[in-house]
Amino acid sequence: MKFIPFTLSALAGGLVAALLVVMLLRPAPPADVHPVRRSPGEYYPAAAPVAETAPLPDLPAAAVDLRLAARRATPTVVHVDARVEGRDRATVKALFGREESSGTLGGEGSGVIYSADGYIVTNYHVVQAADNITVTTADRRRFPATVVGTEPKTDLAVLKIDARNLPFLELADSDAAEPGQWVLAVGSPLGLVSTVTAGIVSAKGRNLSLLRDPDAIESFIQTDAAVNPGNSGGPLVDTEGRLLGINTAIASRTGRFQGYSFAIPSELVKRIVDDIIQYGSYRRAIMGVEISSLMPADQQRLGLRDRTEGVIVDAIFPGGAAETAGLRVNDLIVAVDGRPVRDLPDLTEIIGRARPGDRLRMTVVRENKSRELTIDLLPAGN
């Protein structure tokens, strides 16, 4: 049995040699990758840094749970039934797209309770030309509603019912909304009351040329939450159950949802609705210009270097705020109060949310040089 010590010595020597070989042959980490210790004796390369425009909030590891948002939003959503009497049948059917077997003409949609004392927000096209409007709340109470005011250029309307202590939603900051975040659409699509659908924000600042007025304000939040006829006027809410927008339109070749729906952002809704409640109408501020999104032809015509976004000033109205501020035709507006202006919807929303008398700081590019101008907005009609 004397050979045992020699055997153990040989095994030990072999193990040491093997470890040395492994360590020598193991490739060193690249210079820009730092080993991170996971547990004693174990290392792995750290992931390469990812470029981010802003830090993201801590997100839960579990799947997104939208039940709380649905519980908060559903009681605040109403069904709006708008009926018309004594008008041309063909005209009204074209407006509302509905004719019941009883011969009654009208339309229906959704709305969201804006305040506990009975103010309700919906779309203008839901109640347009209606003589009798009935609102049904989530608990199946029915109320006659009156129109407080409308703003066709944004497709918004405010209704009032005689009720108190109604549930309503906190407003979300639509400026902070980002593509990829979860949202819910709540309403009465195809007559199915209190329907909740989910999706994500797909894009912001969409202009569909849906509203025919030349100075209409279109800067929609685009989502892929299913929205169908009857959803119009209902809320788009975030995962906290806060009002992020008013569902208004779908992009479809069939008249039914095909993956694209659009909502008026909450910050614009608040600005217009608060005016309607306080004054009976929206008090709009104007610049006194004609504007359009920057196009490749404009870049070439004006010799703009390294500029692919912004809004071109096409005309200036005499005596308007823009003329007083020193704005000129062919100026390229690229920012307002530090907020970037990519295209026409960005600027129309910014001006639409401003009030007459507000002073804005505009960054413009003129002859390839950036400059700051201060503009004092005037009320519409001046």
Q: Could you tell me what each predicted segment is?
A:
Residues 333:
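Short alpha-helical segments in extracytoplasmic peptidoglycan/chitin-binding modules
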